[in-house]
Amino acid sequence: MAWPNKRNSELRERANKVIPGGMYGHQSTALLPDVYPQFFSRAHGTRLWDPDGNEYIDYMCAYGPNLLGYGHETVEAAAAAQQRLGDTLTGPPEIMVTLAEKFVSLVSHADWAMFCKNGTDATSMAMVTARAYLDRKKILVASKTYHGSAPWCTPRTAGIVAEDRAQIIYYEYNNPESLESAFRSAGDDVAGVFASAFRHEVFEDQWMPDPEFANLARKLCDNSGALLIVDDVRAGFRVARDCTWSKVGVKPDLSAWGKVIANGYPISALLGSERFREAARRVFVTGSFWFSAVPMAAAIATLDQIEKSGYLEQMEKTGRLLRDGLHQQAAAYGYSLRQTGPAQMPQIFFEDDPDYRLKYCWCEEALVRGVYLHPYHNMFICAALTEEDVRLTLEATGEAFAALKKRQPTLEPVEKVNMLLAQRK
């Protein structure tokens, strides 16, 4: 099937000359099928357009930040109004106070907020705040869990030395015995325990937090004086209008936020409860653009939509429609899918596909039919997605299943993925 990508190919060639690897970080397409565009030219609602003019129904939502739909009218109006007044100033804007008030009013465990730019900023702020509270060193982190790209947590080890992680102790997510063992290993020096909102790692099925595990984490932190830190950067406000762990009835001491809170404008946050306010005050954290006003205005408008609109119910509804439709399609072509996690944050794998050749081929065939899915990362549904969008998506994925069935006898293992997975073991 013809799929124009001349402009994207030219951009890749130019990028390779001036950007290491042609692109870096989580938005590099190096591990995706070759037809995937590296660059995009514009977006609106649920749609993306690449430089060659190809249009996609986007199920990655900028890897999470697009919650309400690209270019949401209310959010864009708030951002534009603030831009006319000023963005990055000599001091923070007055709306920073309004934003903090709004945020803590929505999150039940929170009494204060600090703002930054990216999820890594927020999780790293949480770590130093936890250490400052009782002057302890050890941080407990679930193994093979993504909390950002700082030296203490980046999944790639190039440029990282052992000292960067000397005070990190690992445990298995949702495993009470493993968590208790990690506490014992740390003795009386546990500063904090990081836990993802739910398990949402690449190349893995997703798991929601088990109530027994979540309550044990809370109990162990209470008994030891350690801080319980929920990383809600990816899942925040996509599962609940509160911290995601509110779904299991557990309140953390700190929570890290990002992605959706300004519907794509660059801002993240650390939220905390009253007892840890003084520790947060004592740490020195800052950045040249952390106090920019335009993202804060966008965040206020976004949080207002989160509080008052039916965005969450809309995402859940269309997510379930898509999930049910894909199950039916897969079965019709003799395939079985594992669809895990919340329907509005779907992770999809094929059964009996250990080297990912089926998933990669299916995603490639969907892409050239105008649907942007991801072969190994969890996906995201935004509130702008309609039932008609789902219908069009299923039309494309149905054709993709048919194409996969024809191509399956000649498919080869995805070598670049298998090499990466071998390194992760």
What are these regions (language model features)?
Residues A2-R42:
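Active-site-adjacent loop/helix segments that line or gate small-molecule/cofactor pockets in enzymes
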Residues E55-Y133:
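Glycine-rich loop-to-alpha-helix module at the N-terminal edge of alpha/beta enzyme cores
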Residues T98-A195, R199, E212:
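PLP-dependent aspartate aminotransferase-fold enzymes
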Residues F198-S224:
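Active-site core of PLP-dependent enzymes with the aminotransferase class I/II
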Residues G249-A280, F291-A298:
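Active-site PLP attachment segment
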Residues T302-H327:
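Structural signature of PLP-dependent enzymes
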Residues E307-S309, V368-K425:
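PLP-dependent enzyme catalytic core of the Aspartate aminotransferase-like
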Residues R320-D324, A330-E364, E415-K425:
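Conserved PLP-binding catalytic core of the aspartate aminotransferase-like
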